């Protein structure tokens, strides 16, 4: 068994070496040194938001480089232990060494997946918006189910989730919601979920419990402090303030602290009412607007590339990217990758990583 472990580890180390070659850790180390120089400048903290973004980027880069180096050291130590056990003919250690090998194998697979996140903003935090579509109250309930699913998914990954805006439905569910997801590669993973999600089930909102099809659209945007693709001019903005509303329209705050920003050239409207002050809501709304404008430009570029390949499809409600069947059978099927599972409840509880991984790997094959 020790000889088999040795051969298997060598295969894993070859995969690992190939991954490191794609990653260019030297470039990341150089960026770390550049950011450390900028971080030492006292004037950086005159703009706290920029300073915070820089420090987050620096921390993530250091963590990423440390992860790769630690994994390299683990494999080296494991190889030495296997070799020592082979020399001594001690098979009693085989079970423990095999367990460590499996752990290393899982870690390499995780690093391999992150290599697929090679987009310019994949390592950023994300804003995720959900909009109820066709289906009335059922669609609004479906949007609320998706909000719970993504919140649970983010929490499972150790991400931080902040509610930015929420518009509740008249009878049940939500009309729309926007959350901020903060953590390593939040946008890179979450962008796999952008598109139209379809639910087929027996409606709990009518006496006959007839079969109902509901739709909701999910948008995912990278959070960036600045991007060359985006320019926001003050004269292009209309900013309105209003009183934050809770369930049933009850006022939450004693002052008009909620903010609505309209980007006049594009018609994009962003609201934020979850922060404590009007100034904070305005700053958050501007961050969401910047992210929406960037995602709009990235989508335009992607559509142009798709047209050149003859693959363009309009993002219409008939072009759902995933269907969740609760009746007559239970199944979740992704129409982009054909990945599916019958464990619908687990998916709705946030276990969507297999769908995300299938999407990322399919994108690499297409490119």
UniProtKB/Swiss-Prot annotation:
Q: Which UniProt keywords apply?
A: Cytoplasm, Methylation, Protein biosynthesis
Domain of life (superkingdom):
Bacteria
Query: Cellular location of this protein?
Result: Cytoplasm
Question: What do the Gene Ontology cellular component annotations say?
Answer: cytoplasm
Family per similarity comment: Belongs to the prokaryotic/mitochondrial release factor family.
Species for this entry: Chloroflexus aggregans (strain MD-66 / DSM 9485)
**PANTHER family given for it?**
CLASS I PEPTIDE CHAIN RELEASE FACTOR, PEPTIDE CHAIN RELEASE FACTOR 2
Sites of N5-methylglutamine modification: 250
Q: What is this protein's name? A: Peptide chain release factor 2
Q: Which GO terms describe its molecular function?
A: translation release factor activity, codon specific
UniProt-listed Gene3D superfamilies: 3.30.160.20, 3.30.70.1660, Release factor (1.20.58.410)
SMART domains under this entry?
PCRF (SM00937)
What is the purpose of this protein? Answer: Peptide chain release factor 2 directs the termination of translation in response to the peptide chain termination codons UGA and UAA.
Q: Quote the PTM field.
A: Methylated by PrmC. Methylation increases the termination efficiency of RF2.
Grouped into one coarse class, the protein's main location is: cytoplasm
